[in-house]
Amino acid sequence: MSSYASQLHEEQQAVDRAYGRLDDLRAEMWQRLSTVRAAGSHGSPTQRTERDSFATMYEDRLTQLRSVEDRLVFGRLDSQDGTRHYIGRIGLSSTNHEPILTDWRAEAARPFYEATPSNHGDIVMRRHITLSFREVVGVEDEVLDVHSDQVGQASTAGTLTGEGALLASLSSR
């Protein structure tokens, strides 16, 4: 398997994990909604109002979970300490509350849009992930810290693009 193909495979595993969690959440919301609807329209006015409120909440959540199907994951940030944060259209956590995907609007995703080679903070690399439905079809890396080990790795894998590629080329001379 080529370096680029192995990068695609690695990202596919992360994307599969995110979509797996999305599918689980959809099933969970559908089950909760079905349970609320099965309760019928009997009970006190307070109970009916509460049931209707829960039904609306579950319907809204299902709508949200359906709306993010296309291009759920589109980026990754790599930090100096080796941690990776995937960026996407919605925030997702595992059942143990470990982050799987960071919502693009969250403060934690801000470096994905704002980091530059001259002002990157602790971000070493930004990766753009291209999906076709649920399949990873492309990755492009922008190395923001040209002194990091990831410059060579991204260059070897053929994923290096943007200003990072230019700066890496200039700093290697």
Q: Language-model features: where?
A:
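Extended, charged low-complexity regulatory segments
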Residues: 1-172
